[in-house]
């Protein structure tokens, strides 16, 4: 099997895997660039000497400063929580594409407001207010983009295409981690030094805003809203096939059958998906989607993203530039491994197996880091030029090893699964619920991480290690493998027991449904061989 080999749910023309679907996914993923950048730059910006001086951090007690920093960071997640819920309404009434335009505008307004902050009259309030608006923008976008991409994607590359969303997140994060290293080493600690990282937020948001005028609406949303002619045009353009092509005919029939079934079972209308929550199978799917983000945030990733200087200081890394450099390398490792996950792991190795590997390896790394901090107490060293011991170097190695386990597993896979697991009538609501869960747990982590490090010290790492172990049990018993399964067959996938064999069983069913004659012919041939052997 070659690196980019694909497991198709049915014979697929090569024309389907064309530049159009990848380009649309890339443009939509400018949303994740702005999310990744905002998640990464804020922690190191708060550590810039110019920012500390501008807002007089030296006058705060350690507890008061931790509270201020956690508020600056966490209001963004609070806004994102509500933005992800607002996206359900905008998705229903405006569609996926126009929703992206609307949320990019909200983000741009929020980013512009942040630039008005200063250390005198206006104070830090514009940053807090702007981050609330920016959070609403990224919350809505985090809901829309995985849905949009999954509805455009052929099943064999759906994980890869939704993975572009995660790649955008890592590219934005990489820039966010390195930009403060750059301004800290090349600029004097003036107001401009900390304003530049805030201003750069406008770039990915502007690209998303402009690009959203070019990309088409989701064909599945168009079919669901009675715009059949436009839907056919978009689908044929996206697949690079004629309307009469067998692949197009089959895909449209699957979409129609799915819509008809849910029109009978759930009905159409803005409130109908809420009524579907009465069904236990829908409740269960919502629960699973939310829990994936509990386990993702329970890995410790957002404690590191938002408070990387604090995290590295706890290991024993001192000095502003050294901390920024270490954080920047963390961003590089994440991006490289995201590319590996995107090109190979997510659609070939599969979702479940990667989650198992990531949780097991990541937990072991966290146990080691916590044990080192408990024994050596490196965070108590105050000197800027303090040298790392061999144990400290090993702890940093295990930190990057944790990154290597986490990134190609828990970083993007929960988004992929949540983009796949809901049907057409509950997909927007389901993704809104999943995104809201992500931002809720994100808020909890970002709000309390500074206080956790003050109170728990090395125990923070043991806490995250324990949660990663618990996630293994959850995945084994409750999350089926979704790779290569058509969106229209997800209901059947989640009905099959045992969970660990569900994908294999359903793929066999799908192949039989499409090739009953070939299956019967194969059985007849087996009978003839058996009869011949018996005769001999």
Swiss-Prot record:
It comes from the Eukaryota. Its main location: membrane. Residues 1-26, 96-98, 153-160, 217-285, 350-352, 411-435, 480-536 are cytoplasmic. GO terms for biological process: quinate metabolic process. This is Quinate permease. Keywords: Glycoprotein, Membrane, Quinate metabolism, Transmembrane, Transmembrane helix, Transport. Disulfide bonds: none annotated. GO terms for molecular function: carbohydrate:proton symporter activity. Gene3D superfamilies: MFS general substrate transporter like domains. One of its GO terms (cellular component) is membrane. Residues 516-530 have a biased composition (Basic and acidic residues). Residues 516-536 are annotated as: Disordered. It is found in: Membrane. The gene is qa-y. The lineage of its organism: Eukaryota, Fungi, Dikarya, Ascomycota, Pezizomycotina. The chain crosses the membrane at residues 27-47, 75-95, 99-119, 132-152, 161-181, 196-216, 286-306, 328-349, 353-373, 390-410, 436-456, 459-479. Residues 48-74, 120-131, 182-195, 307-327, 374-389, 457-458 are extracellular. It is a multi-pass membrane protein. Glycans are attached at residue 184. Belongs to the major facilitator superfamily. Sugar transporter (TC 2.A.1.1) family.
